[in-house]
């Protein structure tokens, strides 16, 4: 279980935000947020626009529920570094540490995150994901009807590389090491899609659009 009372080692200090500011972190769409505890909206948020895309790494100091709808030409890829699976879910399915997320621009996405959740995200144009899928599979979309995919992103060789890649983002974004590489979007897209395609069926929970 993740303890949201403290701040994890190596994580930037939590700051107090208003919900309107946090709701605009994705920039291309608003996130509707509802507080579920008395901690108040405290978080650490690092983000950078790079190569037509948005990189974001965040730590939540409060429990909340949210919903958003991506515009038709955007997709969202992400990785859960830490969370409480008893309190965190996406479309009714528990979110676990080590899980990778792919959200396509169809319908409303609903989720809940526990205090102490740490995650990294890549918001990128849908055409770039389609191009990568075509490059690796000769098709430009996920299996029919699959608009949201969850899979374990820290098992297997390719998935381990994916976990390591996402783990680099906080240091890149806060400038403590090196800046984002020029090809950071391409690298992350390639490893995310490879891990998604290679993941076994039992590692990809079936997602509905309802809690």
What spans do the regions from the language model cover?
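Conserved short histidine dyad/triad with adjacent acidic residue
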Residues: 36-70
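Conserved hydrophobic/aromatic beta-strand scaffold that supports enzyme active sites
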Residues: 47, 55-57, 76-77, 100-102, ...
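Alpha-helical bundle regulatory/interaction domains
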Residues: 2-40, 86-211
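A generic fold-level signal
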Residues: 50, 69-72, 95, 114-116
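Generic structural motif
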Residues: 53, 60-63, 82-84, 116, ...
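Glycine- and acidic-residue-biased ligand/ion/polar-headgroup-sensing regions
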Residues: 60-87
């Amino acid at each position: 279980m993740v303890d949201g009372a403290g701040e994890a080692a190596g994580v930037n200090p939590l700051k107090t935000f208003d919900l309107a500011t946090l709701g605009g972190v994705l920039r291309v769409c608003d996130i509707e947020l509802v507080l579920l505890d008395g901690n108040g909206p405290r978080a650490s948020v690092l983000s950078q626009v790079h190569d037509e895309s948005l990189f974001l790494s965040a730590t939540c100091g409060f429990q909340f529920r949210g919903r958003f709808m991506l515009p038709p030409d955007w997709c969202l890829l992400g990785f859960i570094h830490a969370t409480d699976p008893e309190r965190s879910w996406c479309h009714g399915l528990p979110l676990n540490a080590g899980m990778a997320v792919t959200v396509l621009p169809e319908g409303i996405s609903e989720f809940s995150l526990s205090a102490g959740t740490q995650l990294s995200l890549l918001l990128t144009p849908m055409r770039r994901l389609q191009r990568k899928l075509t490059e690796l599979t000769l098709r430009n979309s996920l299996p029919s009807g699959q608009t949201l995919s969850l899979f374990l992103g820290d098992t297997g060789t390719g998935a381990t590389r994916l976990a390591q890649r996402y783990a680099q983002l906080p240091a890149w974004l806060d400038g403590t090491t090196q800046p984002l590489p020029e090809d950071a979007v391409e690298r992350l897209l390639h490893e995310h899609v490879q891990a998604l395609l290679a993941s076994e069926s039992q590692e990809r929970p079936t997602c509905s659009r309802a809690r």
